[in-house]
């Protein structure tokens, strides 16, 4: 029979429930986690044995949202969920990052975590719930895992930190920070902020880590009650004699290779050394495993780099720990784009463009809680040539989506409001060279391209990636890390911001024991680096250009009465469609009567404004208009007097004498002066030609149909 085991606890303003033993009993472990009506069902399945020849840890995390969770149908023709959305991909990465370092080294069994959102309260974001569920399921499974972890979202409202703010609170918050960690250490931080100080950001990380201890305590209690036995897994035995032999053959040569500052040359030399060592050892003993030799070589390589850094020696490319690579900053590099920049930092380079569009260019995002529109898009592309390789080119991968989102977080806080700058903005970062921190190069390039495009951003922003090498109590924080330093180090710490404060912080830690002191040193060192980069960027362009590109659409805004909106749109959109075709502009009308006319040609925009003013103008009784005959009937003629308005000239109002046949006096398309006699309650207009042509009449008002 089903035997659910439940833990319930208070977590900030929410009640969290952990339940296991009820569903998916054939999975290695399964947990239903709910937080005030938002429920995520998380399963873990682990393979008992690693595949032969497996050389990496095959962990996959899939986060998936079901529309039934919000009582909705999926969009699209098939009315079924399809490939993961960008939001689902980002949350999958958010779950993956803090759990991956907690699996033991040498554990190569396949593990799959699937988190399915099955119920959603619009005020409670499912991401934290899913992270708690993944932690609980892995802890229950018996799979070798040094957890559990806790997860918390931290907001900053009225100068106070808020634990797990609601969706409404988050809209007003100056901070959106997610922190995850074990009982003793922070492992992951992902955040965007409205120009907060280093101390405020560090305080938020510590606050979130302190508050999430209640999650860890309750997961441990659930494991004590319902956990499966720990797997009898042991790390593969180390071949000490082979390690010593590999070290003797390679250590000195790898040390020399890592004094080569040029990346491609260094990589080529390292590859030669590894091939030589492998060949020499296999010549001595054919029974040795080539994969094992390469793994040991990787460890020797790691130790060579780390020991040099800890000893205070120059880094791989000859820099000191807090030095930034050489910078080259250029703007306006592409002639027909609306804004462009080329940002180069050492061997990392980003070509970044900014494109301005109208509101209809905004992205409509179909989320669980409904649709929303995004007026600022930032896309990051990482082609294989950027690292001198060949590879598949196609739709963006998880890494590209994640890096693009981080760069967007870095720029978002300085973007102007829609009321100040009514454009949709798309920034694209093409990584043309990469050797560390291409996402932060994208932040710098985006800031430059936006300024070049004339987007009135509040201030320039720059980003920097920090690294860490730590052995015992000895640690060194590195500024502007290379790709190798990221791979061989203990921390990847990315900070973006302006001179005023931080806009984005992302931290991934591979080891336990990162203290508040280390984070403080990293943040302060990052500030110095950020200010240095901003100084160089400001030499290229210090303020946004005074005008947008001649190739960008210019948006003109006018206001009309809300009861005139229907007149401008017309039946089935006929009037606005005709206006768009006639004037060659893009016209958007909002519910409050705001009309936006976009065109690259100023004269066309003015023409469209004139036409809209004519359409929305009130018809004055007694005024003479120049009109055009549109229909002839037995009892008179209908005459258009502009603005899509039409009136009837009765047969008795055509001439001073008796008219037997209307066509004797009027033809289709003929232009005639008409005087407005009356507008009745239903808006019908009565016109007269004979009164308009009387000698006493003033000159006719021009027709909009001319």
Curated annotation (Swiss-Prot):
Alphabetical list of Gene3D superfamilies matching this protein: GHMP Kinase, N-terminal domain, K Homology domain, type 1, Nucleic acid-binding proteins
SUPFAM superfamilies: Eukaryotic type KH-domain (KH-domain type I), Nucleic acid-binding proteins, Polynucleotide phosphorylase/guanosine pentaphosphate synthase (PNPase/GPSI), domain 3, Ribonuclease PH domain 2-like, Ribosomal protein S5 domain 2-like
Keyword field: Cytoplasm, Magnesium, Metal-binding, Nucleotidyltransferase, RNA-binding, Transferase
Listed GO CC annotations: cytosol
Residue ranges constituting the S1 motif domain according to the UniProt record: 622-690
Cofactors (names): Mg(2+)
Broad class of where this protein is predominantly found: cytoplasm
Binding site for Mg(2+): 486, 492
Record GO terms (molecular function): 3'-5'-RNA exonuclease activity; magnesium ion binding; polyribonucleotide nucleotidyltransferase activity; RNA binding
EC assignment: 2.7.7.8
Keyword Cytoplasm applies: yes
Localisation: Cytoplasm
BP GO annotations: mRNA catabolic process; RNA processing
Boundaries of every KH domain copy: 553-612
Catalytic activities: RNA(n+1) + phosphate = RNA(n) + a ribonucleoside 5'-diphosphate
Metal-binding in keyword set: yes
Enzyme class of the recorded protein, top EC level: transferase
Family: Belongs to the polyribonucleotide nucleotidyltransferase family.
Assembly information from the UniProt record: Component of the RNA degradosome, which is a multiprotein complex involved in RNA processing and mRNA degradation.
Alphabetized PANTHER family for the sequence: POLYRIBONUCLEOTIDE NUCLEOTIDYLTRANSFERASE, POLYRIBONUCLEOTIDE NUCLEOTIDYLTRANSFERASE 1, MITOCHONDRIAL
Role: Involved in mRNA degradation. Catalyzes the phosphorolysis of single-stranded polyribonucleotides processively in the 3'- to 5'-direction.
Record's protein name: Polyribonucleotide nucleotidyltransferase
Species of origin: Pectobacterium carotovorum subsp. carotovorum (strain PC1)
């Amino acid at each position: 029979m089903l035997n659910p085991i439940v833990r319930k606890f208070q977590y900030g303003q929410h009640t969290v429930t952990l339940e296991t033993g009820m569903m998916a009993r054939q999975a290695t472990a399964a947990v239903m986690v709910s937080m005030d009506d938002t429920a995520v069902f998380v399963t873990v399945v682990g393979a008992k044995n690693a595949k032969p020849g497996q050389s990496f840890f095959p962990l996959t995390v899939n986060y998936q949202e079901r529309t039934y969770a919000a009582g909705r149908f999926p969009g699209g023709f098939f009315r079924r969920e399809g490939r993961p959305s960008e939001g689902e991909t980002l949350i999958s990465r958010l779950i993956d990052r803090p759990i991956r370092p907690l699996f033991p080294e040498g554990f190569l069994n396949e593990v799959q975590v699937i988190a399915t959102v099955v119920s959603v309260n619009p005020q409670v974001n499912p991401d934290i719930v899913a992270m708690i569920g993944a932690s609980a399921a892995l802890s229950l499974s018996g799979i070798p895992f040094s957890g559990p972890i806790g997860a918390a979202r931290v907001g900053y409202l009225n100068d106070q930190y808020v634990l797990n703010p609601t969706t409404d609170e988050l809209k007003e918050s100056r901070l959106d920070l997610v922190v995850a960690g074990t009982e003793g250490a922070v492992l992951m931080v992902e955040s965007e902020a409205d120009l907060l100080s280093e101390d405020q950001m560090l305080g938020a990380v510590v606050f979130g880590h302190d508050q999430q201890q209640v999650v860890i305590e309750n997961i441990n209690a659930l494991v004590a009650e319902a956990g499966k036995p720990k797997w009898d897994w042991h790390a593969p035995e180390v071949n000490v004699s082979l390690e010593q032999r590999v070290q003797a053959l390679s250590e000195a040569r790898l040390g020399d290779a890592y004094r080569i500052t040029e990346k491609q040359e260094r990589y080529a030399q390292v590859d030669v050394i590894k091939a030589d060592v492998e060949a020499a050892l296999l010549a001595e003993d054919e029974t040795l495993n080539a994969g094992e030799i390469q793994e040991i070589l990787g460890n020797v390589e790691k130790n060579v780099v780390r020991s040099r850094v800890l000893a205070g020696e120059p880094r791989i490319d000859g820099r000191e720990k807090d030095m930034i690579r050489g910078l080259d900053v250029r703007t306006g590099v592409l002639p027909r784009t609306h804004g462009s920049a080329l940002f180069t930092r050492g061997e990392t380079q980003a070509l970044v463009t900014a494109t301005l569009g109208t509101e209809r260019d905004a992205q409509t995002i179909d989320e669980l809680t409904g649709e929303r529109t995004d007026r600022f898009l930032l896309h990051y592309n990482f082609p294989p040539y950027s690292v001198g390789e060949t590879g598949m080119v196609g739709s963006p991968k998880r890494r590209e989506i994640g890096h693009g989102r981080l760069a967007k977080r870095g720029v978002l806080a300085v973007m102007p409001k829609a009321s100040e700058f009514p454009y949709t903005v798309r920034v694209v970062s093409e990584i043309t060279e990469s050797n560390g921190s291409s996402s932060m190069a994208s932040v710098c390039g985006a800031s430059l391209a936006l300024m070049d495009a004339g987007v009135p951003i509040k201030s320039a922003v720059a980003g920097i990636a920090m690294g860490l090498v730590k052995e015992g109590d000895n640690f060194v924080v590195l500024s502007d890390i290379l790709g190798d330093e990221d791979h061989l180090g203990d921390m990847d710490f990315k900070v973006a911001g302006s001179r005023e404060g931080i806009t984005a912080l992302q931290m991934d830690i591979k080891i336990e024991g990162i203290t508040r002191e280390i984070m403080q040193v990293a943040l302060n060192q990052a500030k110095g680096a950020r200010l240095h980069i901003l100084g160089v960027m400001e030499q290229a362009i210090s303020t946004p250009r005074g005008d947008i590109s001649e190739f960008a659409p210019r948006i003109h805004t006018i206001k009309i009465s809300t009861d005139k909106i229907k007149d401008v749109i017309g039946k089935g959109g006929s009037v606005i469609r005709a206006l768009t075709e006639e004037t060659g502009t893009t016209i958007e009308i909002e519910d409050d009567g705001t009309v936006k006319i976009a065109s690259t040609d100023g004269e066309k925009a003015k023409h469209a404004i004139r036409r809209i003013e004519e359409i929305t103008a009130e018809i004055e009784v007694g005024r003479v208009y120049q009109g055009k005959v549109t229909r002839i009937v037995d009892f008179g003629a209908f005459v258009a007097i502009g603005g899509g308005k039409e009136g009837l000239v009765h047969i008795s109002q055509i001439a001073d004498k008796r008219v037997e046949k209307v066509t004797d006096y009027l033809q289709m398309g003929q232009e005639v002066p008409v005087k407005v006699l009356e507008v009745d309650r239903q808006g019908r207009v009565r016109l007269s030609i004979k009164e308009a042509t009387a000698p006493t009449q003033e000159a006719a008002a021009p027709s909009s149909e001319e």
